Amino acid sequence: MRTWCYKLLIFASVLSLAMTGCFPGFPTGVQEVTASPQVEEVALPAPRLKGEMSLEETLAARRSVRQFTETELTLEEISQLLWAAQGITVAWGGRTAPSAGALYPLEVYVATADGLYHYVPQGHQAIVESRADLRDELWQAGLSQNAIREAPAVFVITAVYARTEKKYGERAERYVKLEAGHAAQNLLLQAVALGLGGVPIGAFYDDQVQSALSLPSDHEPLYLIPIGHLR
């Protein structure tokens, strides 16, 4: 009996260490990010966990919106939208959208008049990738859909398939695309809750989006989501 209890105690200890990331390869839901001294980071306001609309009201009000005013989004609004798409919600790294194996293959960017920002869920911050307004380039890549050029912010959801392939092989493509849909719906519902609107766009030239944003070669764009104030 004592031997059995001792073995159980050892197993529990090892499992606890693994879940806290002490053993490499164990899925903790946290992607490692190596900071560079040259990287310009933007601290985002803490996300709000209580809004003014119920989930049911948000679902009923959601519509695809393609026309926007020129009003820019506030940093608080951008912060809330990024958190809704991929924010961390529990200590071990779980996020707002479910992920197969907690491998989190998605990366979210947002293009505004002030530049291009890459969301880092760890620490809830954004990295400045460019100080250029790249929305016109995205508009051209997106088959000249006016919503892309008119919106004050265009969110770009990309996928790094290798993160999921290492565990799920050929099934990874399906799981990653399902996950992108989860994140996009979170983003769109959060927009409604903030009094904003948006539209998910899948019609674009992948290579042109990658080129416009100077994305890493393994970041495949899956969504362009223009968001702004309703006209």
Regions from the PLM with identified roles:
Residues R62, L81, V108, A153-I157, ...:
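Small-aliphatic-rich amphipathic alpha-helix that forms the alpha element of a beta-alpha
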